[in-house]
């Protein structure tokens, strides 16, 4: 059975998460109880809650524990609850809601026009395509059927001396 986020931004402030830490806990619990699928950049409710909360709080993901006590503005709480409600009730993947996704350690703009980048090819790129390719650094690379272009752009980033073409229909 799914779980619906019933708290709205206009309800009593006593009931709403007021700090980053409270928001992380709340979002994680809601996501755990819902029937959403993880696998679009995260594989569990806590990590997805962190991405969502840090996004609305405008904090870097690599923030330390000191941010847990940081208060959230009413606007941030309203945005958080809206995103969480869409995530749970419409089952929209978080990268589509936030318009950002990570691939091969790089951040990309993301929306429903292309598949969310989550290919195992990221690990191949980061590992210089070892053990399947052991020659000199490639001079030309083609990303065919590139979609949003994340693979080709990541390859261009990690192989700066290569000429990279991205092609899609």
Q: Where would I find each of the regions flagged by the language model?
A:
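N-terminal auxiliary segments of SAM/dcSAM-dependent transferases
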Residues: 8-104
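SAM-dependent Rossmann-like transferase core, predominantly class I methyltransferases
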Residues: 68, 78-169
């Amino acid at each position: 059975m799914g779980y619906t986020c019933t708290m709205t931004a206009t309800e009593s402030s006593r009931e709403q998460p007021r700090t980053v830490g409270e928001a992380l806990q709340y979002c994680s619990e809601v996501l755990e109880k819902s029937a959403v699928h993880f696998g679009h950049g995260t594989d569990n409710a806590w990590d997805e809650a962190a991405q969502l909360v840090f996004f609305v709080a405008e904090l870097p993901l690599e923030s330390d524990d000191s941010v847990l006590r940081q208060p959230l503005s009413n606007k941030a709480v309203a945005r958080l609850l809206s995103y969480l409600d869409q995530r749970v009730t419409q089952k929209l993947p978080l990268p589509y809601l936030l318009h950002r996704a990570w691939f091969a350690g790089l951040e990309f703009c993301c929306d429903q026009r292309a598949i969310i980048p989550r290919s195992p090819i990221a690990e191949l790129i980061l590992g210089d395509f070892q053990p399947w390719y052991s020659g000199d650094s490639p001079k030309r690379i083609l990303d065919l059927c590139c979609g949003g272009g994340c693979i080709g752009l990541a390859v261009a980033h990690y192989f700066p001396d290569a000429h990279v073409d991205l092609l899609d229909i």
